[in-house]
Curated annotation (Swiss-Prot):
Sorted UniProt keywords: DNA-binding, Nucleus, Repressor, Transcription, Transcription regulation
Transcription regulation is among the record's keywords: yes
Organism in which the protein naturally occurs: Homo sapiens
UniProt-annotated stretches for the region Interaction with SIN3A and SIN3B: 6-23
Localization, UniProt: Nucleus
Protein name (record): Max dimerization protein 4
Gene Ontology CC: chromatin; nucleoplasm
Biased composition (Basic residues): 199-209
Compositionally biased residues, Acidic residues: 153-163
GO biological process: negative regulation of transcription by RNA polymerase II; regulation of transcription by RNA polymerase II
Amino acid sequence: MELNSLLILLEAAEYLERRDREAEHGYASVLPFDGDFAREKTKAAGLVRKAPNNRSSHNELEKHRRAKLRLYLEQLKQLVPLGPDSTRHTTLSLLKRAKVHIKKLEEQDRRALSIKEQLQQEHRFLKRRLEQLSVQSVERVRTDSTGSAVSTDDSEQEVDIEGMEFGPGELDSVGSSSDADDHYSLQSGTGGDSGFGPHCRRLGRPALS
């Protein structure tokens, strides 16, 4: 596009110079002076003088762009799987393969995100379950400790009863009660062994003559 514009400007400048030469030699009538026309003529002449410089700079830019494009294509060859005949691929085939490869990567990315979400849900569920089990374990420990405390109190009460000290009167009553129980047991055992009732023990021995 820029090259076409430069060619048009060059043709316009040559036309203006040709008209000027014809006017100087009397081949054509000179137009009345116009300031705008003069400014356009000066501008066109400046563009003609700058045209070679613009063309060279344009060539440099184009060369730089092509070199950068080749570099990008080489980098793309390293990223896209091309197969054994990678040297025979054209730029168009390389771009098509790159497009297919990008779609595969996007599909893999979607699957990976789905798996990641599932794992996060499982992690949250397991975390809540662990918290519930921890609470139940603490409650069970509290229940066991309460039961052991009650058992300890009962055993302490038994020990206190066994180690209780009695006064003289209380000891006599306990002893008499124990003696009465022993006497009743003895009578029962004697009567059972000899075949006589409890009244037989009241008979004294006969007096000797």
